[in-house]
Amino acid sequence: MWFKNLTVYRFNKPFSVDTESMEKSLEDFTFSPCSSQDISKFGFSNAFGKHGDTLVHTAADRHLICATKEEKILPAQVIKEALEEKVALLESEDGRKLAKKEKDALKDEITTTLLPRAFSRRSQIRALILPEIQMILVDSSSAAKSEELMALLRKAIGTLPIIPMSFKTPIETQLTEWLKESKTPAPFEMQDEAELKSDSDEGGIVRFKQQDLSENEVLAHIEVGKQVHKLALHFGQSVAFLLQSDAAIKRLKFSEEFRAGNDDLGNEDPMARLDADFALMGSELIALVNAVVEALGGLEDSI
């Protein structure tokens, strides 16, 4: 349940959530497994998985949702080889070359035949809807997967006035200044990882890991025009993460001390523990995002 990445959206129109109404809206788009002829299926599932029984889990006007995706694993090479074999056989029998339309029809036929025997894989993606800061935080490092979830949510509830989080000042400009000065705004602390990139195609990319970023070797790249596009940071004593110039927050890692904040509850009641951890995580993520927005100079005005 602890988020590992953040793709952040903000509402560009005031948005509130009625939990009961949202629950009913999501019920029409619940996940169901692939049938023999389905390539993939995507739908909402219980927010707390096997420990929950609602699609929306709400606490303190913070709303957790989850979607499950099942995909059939049908390697393109398998289809290609089967198609080539079938085409060769038919062309030999008919004594002519098959047209593209005929090959496309054969490909569809082969796919239909192979689908029932294909293995499948499942994945889940969660999002935190936060009316109090007018944002949605998606636990994904993939912009495409985040957009897929937002599209499903929009389809379910009818409207979702959101835009990706963006800032008044380019993020790479701020990150470069922090690295150049070896100083970050409180409560952030710079760690030992960064990626610098040149604006020109010829300039290249340089990555540093487990290295003191204040060393001249690192700063020399800024002097020749490279900018910082990824920077590892720590938020107070609670969360380590990688901030990127596209506003993605990746590799979230909550400290053991922070995660132990609810250890006094034990694990005898899984639902109670999940609910407590959800509250703990939600509050810290809100604090983190608000601090990032302030440190980077504020959000870009919405259109």
From Swiss-Prot:
Cytoplasm in keyword set: yes
One BP term from GO: regulation of DNA recombination
Matches recorded under Pfam families: RdgC
Keywords: Cytoplasm, DNA recombination
Localization, UniProt: Cytoplasm, Nucleoid
Gene Ontology CC annotations of this record: bacterial nucleoid; cytoplasm
Presence of the UniProt keyword Repeat in the record: no
Molecular-function annotations in GO: double-stranded DNA binding
Chief location of this protein within or outside the cell: cytoplasm
Transmembrane regions: none
Entry's family note: Belongs to the RdgC family.
Functional note: May be involved in recombination.
PANTHER family cross-referenced by the UniProt entry: RECOMBINATION-ASSOCIATED PROTEIN RDGC
Protein name per the record: Recombination-associated protein RdgC
Gene: rdgC
